[in-house]
Structure formats: structure tokens, C-alpha cells
Amino acid sequence: MAARLCCQLDPARDVLCLRPVGAESRGRPLPGPLGAIPPASPSTVPTDHGAHLSLRGLPVCAFSSAGPCALRFTSARRMETTVNAHRNLPKVLHKRTLGLSVMSTTDLEAYFKDCVFTEWEELGEEMRLKVFVLGGCRHKLVCSPAPCNFFTSA
């Protein structure tokens, strides 16, 4: 079974945060202007924790009981799903948090698994999505093979 993600849109910063379901609702604080987080101690996040889950691309911190690093995406308002290209993904996710049925869980899981994580891992930066990682995770930084310019591309 794939990991279940809780998606939170911060309209003030235009950032979409992805966290596993069950994590603290506020997540971990992200100090600094670029959201950099100091490295975690090895005892805080076991390297094999959650390795059996099938959703590729999530760092080990996503499955930590101590709470995950937020996977933060800039330009979130421009991110669209391939299933419903006319819809804006953050709005769709926000409606789901309000209990409104606008996209099935299967569609959401397929989007994140096949369109985001797989393409970023195998193809590098996917320009079609117009989404860039901001700050990165202290356990895994999703980056294109070319020099990273995520901080200037948003």
C-alpha cells in the first residue's frame, strides 16, 4: 500500500506542503528564509523506517515518528494534475480537506506516485509541472542532473 499524504496549502506563502497522514498538523518549524533545517541525528530517523512502503521518492523522515520534513513546493498554484488538467491541484486538495469529493484518493496517489516522484527521480526536473523544490529535505534533495537553480526559478 502506498503511503498516505496529507497536503496543506499555505496561501500566504503560496506553498504546498506534503506530510504523511498522522503527522503533527503543524509539522516541524522551518527556520531561515529558505526553509533550511539542520541535519537530524541518526537516532531520530531510522534509515530503514518505512522502507517497505511502495511510494517511491519520499525521504525516510516521511515515516519518522518524530515528524517529517515538509516537502515544500513553490509555484503550487500553477501545479495541475494530469487526471484533471483543468483543475488547480492545491484547490482540489483544499476541497478534500473540507470533506468535498472532487478527486478520488486513487487519482491523488497515482498523481504523486507516477507524475511527481517517478518523473523527478528518473527524468530530473519536470518543467511541465512548473514546480520547484524550495530548500530541500535534509534527508533527500530532489534535483535535476543540471546545476540546481530552484531558488531562482520560481
From Swiss-Prot:
Keywords: Activation of host NF-kappa-B by virus, Activator, Apoptosis, Host cytoplasm, Host G2/M cell cycle arrest by virus, Host mitochondrion, Host nucleus, Host-virus interaction, Modulation of host cell cycle by virus, Transcription, Transcription regulation
Pfam families: X (PF00739)
Sequence intervals crossing the membrane: none
Coiled coil residues, start to end: none
Gene Ontology BP annotations: DNA-templated transcription; symbiont-mediated activation of host NF-kappaB cascade; symbiont-mediated arrest of host cell cycle during G2/M transition; viral genome replication
Region (Mitochondrial targeting sequence): 68-117
Function: Multifunctional protein that plays a role in silencing host antiviral defenses and promoting viral transcription. Does not seem to be essential for HBV infection. May be directly involved in development of cirrhosis and liver cancer (hepatocellular carcinoma). Most of cytosolic activities involve modulation of cytosolic calcium. The effect on apoptosis is controversial depending on the cell types in which the studies have been conducted. May induce apoptosis by localizing in mitochondria and causing loss of mitochondrial membrane potential.
Family: Belongs to the orthohepadnavirus protein X family.
Assembly and binders: May form homodimer. May interact with host CEBPA, CFLAR, CREB1, DDB1, E4F1, HBXIP, HSPD1/HSP60, NFKBIA, POLR2E and SMAD4. Interacts with host SMC5-SMC6 complex and induces its degradation. Interacts with host TRPC4AP; leading to prevent ubiquitination of TRPC4AP. Interacts with host PLSCR1; this interaction promotes ubiquitination and degradation of HBx and impairs HBx-mediated cell proliferation.
Protein name: Protein X
Species in which this protein is naturally found: Hepatitis B virus genotype B1 (isolate Japan/Yamagata-2/1998)
Taxonomic lineage of the native organism: Viruses, Riboviria, Pararnavirae, Artverviricota, Revtraviricetes
